[in-house]
Amino acid sequence: MSELKKIIEERRSANNFIEGVKIPDKDFTEIFELLKLDPSCFNIQHSHYLVVTDEGKKEQLRKAAFNQYKVHTASAVILVLGDKLAYKNSENIYSGMLNLGIMSKLDYDNTIRDINNLYEGRGEDFQRSEAIRNTSLSAMMFMLIAKDKGWDTCPMIGFNQDEVRQIFDIPENYEIALMITMGKEDSSKRRMRGYRKPVGEFVSFDSFQ
């Protein structure tokens, strides 16, 4: 069995965590160093991760998450944010390649023009959906890397967006795509894995039918 296959098969959405377990700073650093390689449209890197380990702030989050107990027992709660205006930072992202001669001035100008045309031409709804779409790709990669480091996770959308935004003073240009609880799963309370559709029910080739 390949290591990736093993990680995918062992990853579960943990509903119960062992309370009081601390995640070393070293683990967070190693996870996020790998996560830098996640994909994003035009490499403009929409994602921002707000890591909450402070017990007081976690309890505030728990209240905003309708008192879900796993927010209390998790070692950390990660808010995964997507920047709707990430495209406006594209010049900074690509300037290094221009300065190093990896990209010509013509290619640089054309790339920046294409990015601006895409995001500004399609408007605010597209900017929002792109922030969520790209950040969700990143979040899945985060959970796989965390599992590889021995940590369990659970993606969540059951929380009051406005309350969470207010608690952490999150700027309006950031969408809260999801929340991830993280820690060591209490596997004694684990439920059986839910039913999964056969491949033939969710995969088709060359046409939908």
Give the label of every model feature segment.
Residues M1-Q209:
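Acidic, surface-exposed loops and disordered segments
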